[in-house]
């Protein structure tokens, strides 16, 4: 039997400006950019197009690479079947899927997932994450599971995974209360361990139920806990091929957002992909900490009604994140700023940011510029190249001794799209003059020249 996951994956995205982006089966694609540029809409478009070709806004089409693995084997493993004539009916998370002898051939012949959309694609928008925490009706152990909580309620693998990952963020376990009655709520509290002696099993279960009744229930907690839990409830279902997660940081404090990024990166297998829209540096850092080689960043900007897309591919992301100094810098914050200035050191950043802020305030404006220290001039070209690839407005301020190293300066020049031969002659003249015997400076002439430069800069 093949180990290839049934279903398929999105192998290419076509954007409305004509840009095409190749996607790997295990890619984690992160959409970033200013507000109202199309990040969330991109996820909505992908979900709609995964079903069938239809009019969309930002993403105009997708290409899906199908797996030849038998769909019936997957359905048999996750849901009981009900025979209806020549077809078998499977109920999975409230969605009905019919299978007959022609299903696999028909599935492979169609370009999209069609009726199997919700078997292979999990769409985790904010509303879905909050409402999925509501307790589902109780079912028998062998009944079709139409809610993720049913999986945690009747399979210890899911229950333990859910509780362990919830505890990473909030320091406490959660458990499904299958003895609650008509519904199965998720309860927050230490794992119940009964050490007493009981006359019979019924008495032990009654004591277990009474302890869970004292615990707080997830659906009654704040939106942060509910949103976090909602993502976990879908992530634990490993038969999905593609996850769409809109702003997973919603309602979360930065530490929990970072943990969520780590959990997503740890959980997704190499046969699963994920598309995320986010405003959170912490989500991105969490993902990068565990799986930098899988990350692809797509920055979306918009001018009037036209979208523009810039891509930072996996190898470039991994290269930057592999540098220890850059890993612990604020470089990822640049994805959410209007402009960026690169400096050599943190003290340079502080000095220039004070100057820039003062100038902006004198005109009644606020600074939208991020100053990033590169840990020295040798890293400047690498960072500038990466940020420019994402269409970020980048400026660079280096110390004058950058001119002492021909290769470093050449790398910086080329990182800004300037051909080295066009500046090499002037560079050589300046360097030759810098290294020539020093002449005495006339202070009055220097003062006059400096004042003239300042006056002309207004």
Predicted regions and their residues:
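Switch/communication elements of ASCE P-loop NTPase nucleotide-binding domains
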Residues: 1-52, 197-333, 350
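Charged, glycine/proline-rich intrinsically disordered loops and linkers
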Residues: 69-90, 195-216, 220, 423-457
